[in-house]
Amino acid sequence: DFSQGHRIFAYLSKKFSYAKNKLATTVSLTYTGQSGSPVSYVYAGSAMVRDADPSGGLTNDLIYVPTSSDLAGMTFLSNTVNGVTFTPDQQKAALNTFIQNDGYLKTRRGQFAERNGGRTPFTNILDFRIAQDFNIKLGKDRVQFQLVYQIANVGNLINRNWGRNYFAANDQVGLVTFVGYASTTNLTPQYRFNPAFNTNGAFNVSDSPVPNYGSR
């Protein structure tokens, strides 16, 4: 749960002096790159084994990551999301696409996902800073003062999709919903998948540390 992954830090600065060194402007950029937090891919919905019914719609049951041929034999029920109904075949195709586009899940096809095996996306934060120095002579003394303007997460100012920090509630992603078994005598598992995962992603955008740009 507490694996930090990798962290990259870079700093670039340039100072420009002029007006016989009475004035100076310093422009700097700071880059911080951080691996995402560990996450587990679990079933949403009903508990699959003898667990108590889950709270919050998530179980602790790690998902089986199906191969393409596995998907063909799985039972999906129609799923209506925001007024749009997806057929079982549409859900299977969407889940297959999601798995193939996920760097971790595509390596686990035909196996169960591992606890904390996945990660939220890598975070890239770029901060901008400009400092203006003034050297003023007051009588026999020379006084220097500085005005500073900073923009935190300037990438997010340029593009709202840049500089985002992601998280998963309780470090779990309920990727596939386990609806239940066909009947008490037919233990064929039934599932649903929300194709919106392919457009909206599986993670939430965090308010920490710097989800949106800010200046001071």
Task: Enumerate the predicted regions with their spans.
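Short, solvent-exposed micro-motifs at the edges of structured domains
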Residues: 1-216
